Amino acid sequence: MEQNLSKKTRTESNLIGSREVPESALYGVQTLRGIENFRISKFHLNEYPLFIQALAITKMGAAVANRELELLTEEQTDAILKACKEILEGKHHDQFPVDMIQGGAGTTTNMNANEVIANRALELMGHARGEYQYCSPNDHVNRSQSTNDAYPTAIHIGLYYTHLKLVKHFATLIEAFRKKGAEFAHIIKMGRTQLEDAVPMTLGQTFNGFASILEHELKNLDFAAQDFLTVNMGATAIGTGITAEPEYAEKCIAALRKITGLDIKLADDLIGATSDTSCMVGYSSAMRRVAVKMNKICNDLRLLASGPRCGLGEINLPAMQPGSSIMPGKVNPVIPEVMNQVSYKVIGNDLCVAMSGEAAQMELNVMEPVMAQCCFESADLLMNGFDTLRTLCIDGITANEEKCRRDVHNSIGVVTALNPVIGYKHSTKIAKEALETGKGVYELVLEHNILSKEDLDTILKPENMIKPVKLDIHPNH
């Protein structure tokens, strides 16, 4: 991947040697080496704007703290802060070309941010890019920091902001299910267990059930996200705080709280926090739980809409596109299907996060880059999936009310409602005879004079079969 190529270059050097960097690039030699070393995926940092902004926020917090400790000049601080604010405004994001999946525990990403901010700060100070004696990526932008605290802090902030977006999309989807629950509240249908007829319920109860299980996952997701607000900024390399002054961590956290408005806290034990990635493990797991529930719901939607003539056919999903290149007139449930696939991808990403989480060794987990990429990707997939499912499927679902009513009338499952009155033994006989003869339960109960028509109608009223009721009815014999 090549960025900002031009004929003019500037020479930059580091431990490995000197390289020619495009003069038009805000990034420097560290980023250039990262581009060359990590041609791994198509997931690049510039595709994750909230992460880039979180990196800028982290550097702003550090700059404010360093200025208060008189470790940066006022001119350097002002220029660094202005450069970071431009990044927050969406500028310079094309200058973050590195692969999200990289060796080095995130050093390439951290240095990409340091170099972009330093070179833009140099311009604001009236200097040329690369004149690092005036504002250095390492000595000034990265002052009092290590990749091992700045990078995970930025991940936490970026993922928390991503979470805030995700829950809005999620809540809107849940509300769509609630609306369908209200719309279909009057439609009686058969409930099913193990894909066999069970007892009656309403179609509204089905959709409200979907909403309720998702609301529970929304709460769980929000609970897991709170761990992102605890950071290890000030830990530097391994948690001892080497190269940082005693008051730095406290001042940096205060600055981050002010900049973000978030309740950011410093971890109690910086040694432990520096190697601990459990917040990503926990949040990815919460997204996996959402994916599992979405799979169940989408599978149910596909079953409920199966047919159109030889399936359950209780609901109609919006027809989005022809379903077959060979079968004329066939329309498939493509939107629930794509949400299924989104869910499988999220579940797969969670396995990657879990395995990477247990890969920490000693005082650091070098697998944070792929963990972060998986978490950001899963959240993006879910947001897109939620919106697609809501707008192209849920909002347009209609009910086949007569089909639902007819299935209840013909079902043997309604015999369950007779249990409290005529007993399990007699109910079983009625069910068996209905299966053998093809007659309905209603017809057989009257035929055998087990109940009066009035009592039978009372028991089998839809409103009496979809909730707990107390009926004072006795059999004829």
Placement of each model-derived feature along the sequence:
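Conserved, well-structured ligand/cofactor-binding cores
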Residues: 1-477
